[in-house]
Swiss-Prot record:
Family annotation (CDD domains): Ribosomal_uL14
Database matches in PANTHER family: 50S/60S RIBOSOMAL PROTEIN L14/L23, LARGE RIBOSOMAL SUBUNIT PROTEIN UL14M
Protein purpose: Binds to 23S rRNA. Forms part of two intersubunit bridges in the 70S ribosome.
Quaternary assembly: Part of the 50S ribosomal subunit. Forms a cluster with proteins L3 and L19. In the 70S ribosome, L14 and L19 interact and together make contacts with the 16S rRNA in bridges B5 and B8.
Pfam family, one: Ribosomal_L14
GO biological process, one term: translation
Keywords: Ribonucleoprotein, Ribosomal protein, RNA-binding, rRNA-binding
Taxonomic superkingdom: Bacteria
A cellular-component GO term for this protein: cytosolic large ribosomal subunit
UniProt xrefs under Gene3D superfamilies: Ribosomal protein L14 (2.40.150.20)
GO-annotated molecular function: large ribosomal subunit rRNA binding; structural constituent of ribosome
Name of this chain's protein: Large ribosomal subunit protein uL14
Amino acid sequence: MIQVESKLDVADNSGAKKVSCIKVLGGSKRRYASVGDIIVVSVKEAMPHSKVKKGAVMKAVVVRTKKEIGRPDGSYIKFDNNSAVLLNNSMDPVGTRIFGPVARELRGAGFMKIVSLAPEVL
C-alpha cells in the first residue's frame, strides 16, 4: 500500500536507488497504490554517472509491497520491502535488468517486459 510521500527502493539498474511517491495515478481522489499500479516518483538517491539523476520526476510501477495482496484462490503474498521499477514515457522500463522477485499481478496489469526480465515471479 503506497501513498504520497512513501519511500520505495528501485528494483532495476537504471541507477536510481531510492524514490519517493509524489502522486498515485488513476483518479483524482485515489489515495493508495498496490502491485501493478503506476505512480509518479521523484528520485531521492541515484548512483553517479547513471541514466537517472537525483531530482528527476518519472513514472514507476510498483512491483513489491509490504502490505499483503489477496489472490483469487484465497492465498496472500507480501514482500520484505516496497519496490518500484522506473518507466519511460512509453511505459517501458528504463533499466535493462530487474532485481529480486516480482508479483504475478504484473502480468495481468500488462507489464510483460518486466515479468520477462525478472529472475522470479511469485
